[in-house]
UniProtKB/Swiss-Prot annotation:
One of its GO terms (biological process) is arginine catabolic process. The modification Pyruvic acid (Ser) is found at residue 43. The record marks 42-43 as: Cleavage (non-hydrolytic). It catalyses: L-arginine + H(+) = agmatine + CO2. InterPro entries: Pyr-dep_his/arg-deCO2ase (IPR016104), Pyr-dep_his/arg-deCO2ase_sand (IPR016105), Pyruvoyl-dep_arg_deCO2ase (IPR002724). PANTHER family: PYRUVOYL-DEPENDENT ARGININE DECARBOXYLASE. This is Probable pyruvoyl-dependent arginine decarboxylase. Disulfide bonds: none annotated. Binds 1 pyruvoyl group covalently per subunit. The keyword tRNA-binding does not apply. It comes from Chlorobium limicola (strain DSM 245 / NBRC 103803 / 6330). One of its GO terms (molecular function) is arginine decarboxylase activity.
Length: 181
């Protein structure tokens, strides 16, 4: 059986509860994907895959459905501990080629820091497969310009969720790319 996703939507959530597993469930609910049996997959953005809204994507899901997703996930039970989770995306200009999705789930990084890092990871993976020359020691903004000016990478972005731990509770953050037929 061959399954290449034709649609993708991006969602994120945060959950807090005294139990670790329950905080994850609440993060899934916040992201509106709790009714699915999620199967995490590695990080290829399929050729000709269309990005759709969360609302459109949710209409295509049924309770109990086996659903493939690239998921970044992080959790803490430490008070004031900053956690984040991000999925970065890099899409080639040629829609018959595949792109990349990357997961990043650090401690102590803001939405912006975490998101830029995840986006940089995805764009760098794509750039290396497309033969784009770049200096890995340059900062992300400079490399992003090089990638996009090459004409081979058309778009990159990220979806990121961060939160601080609350006293006595588990806090879980997730960011997901949900892949659909």
């Amino acid at each position: 059986m061959s399954f290449v996703p034709t649609k993708v939507f991006f969602t994120k959530g945060v959950g807090r509860h005294k139990e670790y597993l329950s905080s994850f469930e609440l993060a899934l609910r916040d992201a509106k994907i709790e009714k699915c049996n999620l199967v995490t997959v590695s990080s290829i953005f399929p050729p000709k895959c269309e990005r759709i809204s969360v609302e459109e994507g949710l209409k295509l899901l049924s309770p109990g459905q086996i659903t493939f997703a690239v998921m970044a996930r992080n959790a803490t039970n430490e008070y004031n501990r900053l956690i984040s989770a991000s999925v970065g995306v890099a899409i080639p200009a040629d829609d018959t080629q595949y792109g990349y999705l990357s997961e990043h789930h650090p401690y102590g990084e803001s939405d912006e820091q975490c998101g830029e890092y995840a986006e940089d990871l995805a764009a760098t993976m794509l750039a290396t497969t497309l033969g784009i020359e770049f200096d890995p020691n340059k900062d992300w903004d400079e490399r992003e310009g090089i990638y996009k000016m090459s004409g081979k990478i058309i778009n990159s972005y990220n979806i990121t969720q961060s939160a601080e731990g609350e006293n006595g509770l588990w806090t879980t953050v997730i960011s997901c790319a949900v892949l659909l037929p």
